[in-house]
């Protein structure tokens, strides 16, 4: 309804419309760029939105705010890992669980070196200044695993001069506790930010406990007005238990996971040219008890263990050669390591295992890319780029991309984009377990997209419409007990988003996505919509949001199952003074019965309250 009113009033508003500052993004481009000049579709979720609902993890907020993005969950808190985990992202029907959607931290890849997927419990709100989600392939800049899109976490830094600290505590349903503390220091050219968190929950089913603690730190030093050196580190440890499905309960299915990420680099910015060189490492240590059937099984005599690391070097430089131009060249190197093995529960010794159940491998990727963007007559922007990526086992891959932005109105843009994405086979697919196959080739995908975005009412209301078509082949599937490149994927759909800043007290936002899949996949809905409202009045703040999901596939095969549900969430806070704020929130306030994964029902209404103190 709001979208119809905005379009109907468009002609009346054009003459008196004035553009406000647009979001400046770094995802889809290696330099800070006005989003109006990018042919890619990027959704920006700022820290004010990420923290409004008092969530310790960014993923639930992204599911609400980003059209086409779906997230699986299993309880009040925690996702876990392995085949029984949740926390998987589905973007336009493309799955992060298969390593086809990448998570970045400040542009550095984050995924498991053995299985190729991101780890949902690693992405804590405490580290994020904002999150930029690029819907569609981003392999030109980020290579393998950015086939379906990327979620780039832009980390916080100390902004205010002097010392500052905060403490946020909360507790609620099912023994859930969350806590976070942080400290910032800015003194001259030096900036330091450090934060830590602890959370735990029994969750709503017996045997589904979750506990997590971790920290994030970032230091920066401005050598001069043009050069800056930085270092950051993030580490988290969590333990999670899996109770099985309702019809097939399990015991002792426990996980102990440690994940970390470190980066160090130096960056330059001269206005007409900017760039960065950095080294990074994303690593993990996993210990998993696969558990046993609660009715007929016996305890496991061994534990699965793994160590993995994704180490890399990234360099890029972007320059304006002449008016309206921007060329970016870059080089990437990655060393991908994985070691999977089993140990005895009784003695701890490493076990010899048959059928490729254990293995230790290392692979390398090296890539170079160039991207060129040119503004023409203030009405057009053209962009084209190409990447060559070579994997030590899977071989080389060319990745082209091209797009155009047309601005027929001073407050509106028409975007057309064609981009290729790819994913190299993982260590598991090539070396682990009987279906493994070292002859696998990369998965490949083309995305074709048309988008329109406009701002009206002096920028208070903006909306966007996207139409896309995805054509993927060489998808890795297990056929006759062997992994082979045989699958195809053809998805098409539409997305709509709208934000309306009514006045200083009220604002609303809504987004909707429709997806048509030739081959349905688990956790991908045919429709997802969100409508949210924010109120700020005096010392009171309130956020209310409702999410509608239709035809969500919870299982596929001969007898597929789907879910329809409506989720109502709300958060209210009150400032006792400038330094102290009380908050309370409720989730699934309609007490819906629903599930993301077949046999794993979600909790009904849950509540939590807490306090935030600034020092």
Locations of the language-model features?
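Short, acidic, small-residue-rich periplasmic hinge/interaction motif at the N-terminus
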Residues: 12-51, 59, 465-466
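Extracytoplasmic beta-strand/coil segments of soluble accessory domains associated
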Residues: 60-108
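Short acidic/polar hinge/loop motifs at secondary-structure boundaries
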Residues: 108-135
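Short strand-turn segments of transmembrane beta-barrel domains in outer membranes
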Residues: 138, 150, 155-185, 196, ...
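Membrane-embedded beta-barrel scaffold of Gram-negative outer-membrane proteins
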Residues: 190, 276-290, 336, 407, ...
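Flexible loop and strand-edge segments within Gram-negative outer membrane beta-barrel domains
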Residues: 201-208, 212, 226-310
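Structural signature of Gram-negative outer-membrane beta-barrels, strongest in the C-terminal barrel
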Residues: 224, 319-326, 352-470, 503-505, ...
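Gram-negative outer-membrane beta-barrel transporters
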Residues: 375-382, 467-471, 485-554, 578-581, ...
């Amino acid at each position: 309804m709001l979208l119809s009113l905005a379009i109907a009033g468009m002609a009346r508003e054009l003459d008196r419309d004035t553009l406000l500052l647009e979001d400046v993004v770094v995802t889809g481009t290696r330099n800070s760029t006005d989003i109006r000049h990018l042919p890619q579709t990027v959704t920006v979720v700022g820290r004010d939105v990420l923290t409004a609902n008092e969530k310790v993890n960014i993923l639930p907020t992204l599911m609400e705010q980003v059209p086409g993005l779906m997230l699986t969950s299993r309880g009040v808190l925690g996702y876990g890992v392995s085949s029984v985990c949740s926390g998987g992202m589905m973007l336009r029907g493309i799955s992060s669980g298969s390593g086809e959607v990448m998570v970045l931290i400040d542009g550095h890849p984050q995924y498991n070196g053995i299985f190729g997927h991101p780890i949902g419990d690693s992405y804590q709100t405490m580290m994020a200044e904002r999150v930029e989600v690029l819907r569609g392939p981003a392999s030109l800049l980020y290579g393998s695993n950015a086939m379906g899109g990327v979620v780039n976490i832009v980390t916080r830094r100390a902004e205010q001069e002097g010392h500052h600290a905060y403490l946020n505590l909360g507790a609620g349903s099912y023994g859930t506790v969350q806590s976070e503390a942080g400290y910032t220091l800015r003194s001259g050219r030096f900036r330091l930010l450090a934060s830590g968190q602890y959370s735990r929950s029994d969750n709503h089913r017996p045997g589904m406990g979750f506990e997590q603690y971790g920290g994030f730190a970032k230091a920066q030093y401005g050598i001069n007005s043009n050069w800056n050196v930085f270092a950051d580190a993030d580490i988290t440890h969590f333990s999670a238990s899996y109770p099985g499905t309702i019809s097939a309960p399990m015991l002792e299915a426990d996980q102990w996971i440690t994940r970390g990420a470190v980066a160090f680099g130096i960056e330059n910015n001269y206005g007409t040219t900017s760039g960065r060189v950095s080294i990074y490492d994303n690593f993990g240590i996993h210990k998993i008890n696969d558990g046993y059937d609660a009715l007929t099984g016996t305890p496991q005599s061994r534990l699965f263990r793994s160590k993995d690391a994704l180490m890399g070097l990234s360099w890029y430089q972007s320059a304006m050669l002449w008016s309206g131009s921007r060329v970016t060249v870059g080089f990437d190197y990655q060393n991908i390591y994985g070691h999977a093995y089993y140990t005895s529960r009784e003695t701890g010794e490493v076990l010899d295992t048959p059928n490729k159940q254990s293995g230790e491998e290392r692979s390398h990727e090296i890539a170079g890319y160039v991207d060129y963007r040119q503004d023409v007559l203030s009405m057009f922007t053209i962009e084209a780029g190409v990447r060559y990526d070579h994997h030590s086992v899977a071989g080389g891959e060319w990745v082209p991309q091209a797009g155009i932005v047309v601005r027929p109105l001073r407050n509106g843009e028409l975007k057309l984009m064609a981009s290729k994405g790819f994913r190299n086979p993982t260590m598991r697919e090539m070396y682990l377990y009987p279906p493994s196959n070292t002859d696998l080739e990369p998965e490949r995908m083309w995305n074709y997209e048309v988008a329109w975005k406009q701002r009206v009412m002096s920028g208070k209301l903006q909306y966007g419409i996207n139409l896309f078509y995805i054509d993927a082949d060489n998808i890795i599937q297990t056929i006759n007990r062997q992994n082979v490149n045989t699958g195809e994927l053809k998805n098409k759909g539409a997305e709509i988003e709208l934000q309306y800043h009514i006045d200083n007290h009220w604002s609303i936002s809504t987004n909707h996505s429709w997806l048509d899949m030739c081959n349905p996949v688990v956790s991908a809905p045919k429709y997802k919509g969100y409508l949210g409202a924010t109120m700020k009045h005096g010392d009171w703040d309130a956020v209310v949001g409702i999410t509608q999901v239709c035809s969500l596939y919870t299982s596929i095969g001969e007898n597929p199952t789907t879910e329809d549900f409506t989720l109502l969430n709300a958060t209210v806070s009150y400032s006792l003074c400038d330094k102290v704020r009380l908050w309370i929130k409720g989730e699934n306030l309609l007490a819906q019965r629903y599930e993301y994964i077949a046999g794993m029902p979600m909790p009904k209404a849950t509540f939590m309250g807490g306090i935030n103190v600034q020092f």
